[in-house]
Amino acid sequence: DKNAFEWTTLNLNANMKDLDGSEKMYLELKGLGAFAQFKLKDGGIVESEYDSVNKVWTIKDIAYDKINDIQFTNDKDTTVDIKAWTTDGIDSTREKPATGFMEVDFAKNAVENGKFTLGKEVNIDFSKIVNGDIQGVNKIDLSAEGENKLLNLTLEDVLSIGTKDVKGNINLTILGDSDDKVTFKNEIGKEWSSNVVNDDKGNKLYTEWSNTTGDTTVTVKVEQPISDGITN
């Protein structure tokens, strides 16, 4: 069984079998979060766009013979409502799309007991998502095999996903190895500062990134040797 934020194949319901085989296919997926990602099984790029108002993903320009090769990630169990249509550049079946659904039932959700775990070769670019889908996090684990990236992490992102301690501050720890990467993004008046610290037992080194807003101090400890720094 797959866990949340691991690559999972998009299985289309059987009542979508009558699609006519035109050159390109489009999908609308409702039920996946803003953190969802898409790719083909062979690593090919899937062009996708998220409508944050209607909470719908649109997947574009998929070759008909690749429709069953689409993989996705999501943070938790859900039902995905699917609409599919074809276009050859002139004619389109969008007005009468095929419809279906997929039940997504993960063995483990992405966030459990405050720990947010990413699967193999899953990346999150915070500049491309809407805050609010992931909450209550105090630890992010990037240690799955392969490269995992957290990109463009702002103060607002950490405020959104983190949980406050009794003093009203947020402490987040990011675990991983040399294959992984974390980048922070400065904003006017909200710049990150960093220094190197040990854990409580003196066994591990971390780069500790700090930022402040009002009475809240945000601290993000990134395990070395994760590659980390400020986005240009």
Spell out what each predicted region is:
Residues 1-112, 161-170, 206, 217, ...:
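Extracellular glycosylation-rich, acidic/polar low-complexity regions of adhesion-
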Residues 25-30, 124, 173-177, 182:
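Surface-exposed beta-strand/loop patches in extracellular or lumenal glycoproteins
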Residues 34-35, 145-148, 178-181:
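Acidic glycine-/aspartate-rich tracts in secreted/extracellular proteins
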Residues 110, 122-134, 138, 148-166, ...:
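Short, T/G/N/S-enriched strand-turn elements that build extracellular solenoid repeat scaffolds
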Residues 114-120:
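Right-handed beta-helix
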Residues 115, 136-139, 173:
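Discrete beta-strand positions within long extracellular beta-solenoid architectures
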Residues 119, 141-143, 175-177:
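Feature marks extracellular polysaccharide-active and adherence modules
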Residues 180-232:
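Low-complexity acidic/polar repeat-biased segments
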